[in-house]
């Protein structure tokens, strides 16, 4: 019997690292962003992590259906609102990186 066909998963992952000048004010901004981003139909997942070794450092990990969906989100009102709300709350610009997922597979 032949093995079932493999289906390639197109997945775009993005990380955004924020170093807070005002952690108490930044955390609610990022938490709201996570909630709103999870409502986007093309968002596979988004997590907010707080560093254990660097207090005030936060990491957003996002997974998107496609590169186009990720780019569209970065131009969205949700992203713009979050970026504007971060003014004065960071010790420097966020570190944003785009990742390839060579080991990605769909759990559905």
For each of these PLM feature ranges, what is it?
Residues 1-9, 48-56, 82-108:
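Glycine-rich beta-strand-turn "strand-cap" elements at beta-sheet edges
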Residues 17-27:
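Short, surface-exposed ligand-recognition loops at beta-strand->loop->(often short) alpha-helix junctions
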Residues 10-17, 47-74:
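Short, well-ordered beta-strand segments in beta-rich or mixed alpha/beta enzyme
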Residues 5, 28, 32-44, 65-97:
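An amphipathic, aromatic/His-enriched active-site/gating alpha helix that lines ligand/cofactor pockets
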Residues 14-16, 76-77, 102-108:
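Short flexible/disordered coil segments
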Residues 22-24, 68, 104:
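Residue-level signal for secondary-structure boundary sites
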